[in-house]
């Protein structure tokens, strides 16, 4: 099959889910607009914030690109895990136990540097401006605390899902982040630190940031968020595309299935 035929087939596969996502965004905007109007009529102080639509040209472009990223991802279940280039981000809760010899912020390393021969590596991809990702960080922290005796954990900070100067989401809670598009590696590491200041992670969890060429994001088809498990340098578990198929409960089930309760409690 020629390259053009493959591209056409992928486009046809993407179109139904793309349009369903557009419908979701339209419904979301309608609900938020009705809520905003109701607050205006009640003269509530909560209406001081600016109302932002999600169904915009920028939003459509981001959603479409996310499906393309997922469709062309290198990572496959049961196959070799891509050894993407990343940079170290110091975890305030962690000691100096990075797999790389250099542990200063911005020190180059690779994703599989954090994988050991015998223990699975749970890799969690996301950014501060992705609400589904940040909402699940307490659950991810719980996983680290419960399973760190039998598994290793790595958080990979990627390109912002909803930068404040791009496809921004309404800042309707105290847990929302205002982060602009990363202009350089320092910006990305700073955004990761901002996330860690709000959501502390156990010292057993290492933190890295994707390079500015987004090579980890592309290889793993992350787009917004994704989680996977690497075991013996192979993909033992590959989570679905975020936000709707991002599921940490499946990670818990995998760990519980592969390790006895006795091992976890040791």
Curated annotation (Swiss-Prot):
It catalyses: 3,3',5-triiodo-L-thyronine + iodide + A + H(+) = L-thyroxine + AH2; 3,3'-diiodo-L-thyronine + iodide + A + H(+) = 3,3',5'-triiodo-L-thyronine + AH2; 3'-iodo-L-thyronine + iodide + A + H(+) = 3',5'-diiodo-L-thyronine + AH2; 3,3'-diiodothyronamine + iodide + A + H(+) = 3,3',5'-triiodothyronamine + AH2. The active site is at 130. GO terms for molecular function: thyroxine 5'-deiodinase activity; thyroxine 5-deiodinase activity; ubiquitin protein ligase binding. The keyword Transmembrane helix applies. Residues 1-9 are lumenal. Expressed in cerebral cortex, cerebellum, pituitary gland, mostly in anterior pituitary gland, and pineal gland, as well as in brown adipose tissue (BAT). It is found in: Endoplasmic reticulum membrane. Keywords: Endoplasmic reticulum, Membrane, Oxidoreductase, Selenocysteine, Thyroid hormones biosynthesis, Transmembrane, Transmembrane helix, Ubl conjugation. Its EC number is 1.21.99.4. Ubiquitinated by MARCHF6, leading to its degradation by the proteasome. Deubiquitinated by USP20 and USP33. It comes from the Eukaryota. The keyword Protease does not apply. One of its GO terms (biological process) is hormone biosynthetic process. It is a single-pass type III membrane protein. Induction: In the pineal gland, exhibits night/day variations with a 9-fold increased expression at night. Up-regulation is due to a large degree to the release of norepinephrine from nerve terminals in the pineal gland and cAMP signaling pathway. In BAT, up-regulated in animals exposed to cold. It is an enzyme of class 1 (oxidoreductase). Residues 35-266 are cytoplasmic. InterPro entries: Iodothyronine_deiodinase, Iodothyronine_deiodinase_AS, Thioredoxin-like_sf. One of its GO terms (cellular component) is endoplasmic reticulum membrane. The chain crosses the membrane at residues 10-34. Predominantly monomer. Can form homodimers but homodimerization is not essential for enzyme activity. Interacts with USP20 and USP33. Interacts with MARCHF6. Plays a crucial role in the metabolism of thyroid hormones (TH) and has specific roles in TH activation and inactivation by deiodination. Catalyzes the deiodination of L-thyroxine (T4) to 3,5,3'-triiodothyronine (T3) and 3',5'-diiodothyronine (3',5'-T2) to 3'-monoiodothyronine (3'-T1) via outer-ring deiodination (ORD). Catalyzes the deiodination of 3,3',5'-triiodothyronine (rT3) to 3,3'-diiodothyronine (3,3'-T2) via ORD. Catalyzes the phenolic ring deiodinations of 3,3',5'-triiodothyronamine and 3',5'- diiodothyronamine. Belongs to the iodothyronine deiodinase family. This is Type II iodothyronine deiodinase. It comes from Rattus norvegicus.
């Amino acid at each position: 099959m020629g390259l053009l035929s493959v591209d056409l087939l992928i486009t046809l596969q993407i179109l139904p889910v793309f349009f369903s996502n557009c419908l979701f965004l339209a419904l979301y905007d309608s609900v938020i607009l009705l809520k905003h109007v109701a607050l205006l009529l009640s003269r509530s102080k909560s209406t001081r914030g600016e109302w932002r639509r999600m169904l915009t040209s920028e939003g459509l472009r981001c959603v479409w690109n996310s499906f393309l990223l997922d469709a062309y991802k290198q990572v496959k279940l049961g196959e070799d895990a891509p050894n993407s280039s990343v940079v170290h981000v110091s975890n305030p809760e962690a000691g100096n136990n990075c797999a790389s010899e250099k542990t200063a912020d911005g020190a180059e390393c690779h994703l599989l540097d954090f994988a050991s021969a015998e223990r699975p590596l749970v890799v969690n991809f996301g950014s501060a401006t992705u609400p589904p990702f940040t909402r699940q960080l307490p659950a991810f922290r719980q996983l680290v605390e419960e399973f760190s005796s039998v598994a290793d954990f790595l958080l990979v900070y990627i390109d912002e899902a909803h930068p404040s100067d791009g496809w921004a989401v309404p800042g309707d809670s105290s847990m929302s982040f205002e982060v602009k598009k990363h202009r350089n590696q320092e910006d990305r590491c700073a955004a990761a630190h901002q996330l860690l200041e709000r959501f502390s992670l156990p010292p057993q969890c290492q933190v890295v940031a994707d390079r500015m060429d987004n090579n980890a994001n592309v290889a793993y088809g992350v787009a917004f968020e994704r989680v996977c498990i690497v075991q013996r340098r192979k993909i033992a578990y590959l989570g679905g595309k975020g936000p709707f198929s991002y599921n940490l409960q499946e990670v818990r089930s995998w760990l519980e299935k592969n390790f006895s309760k006795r091992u976890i409690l040791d």
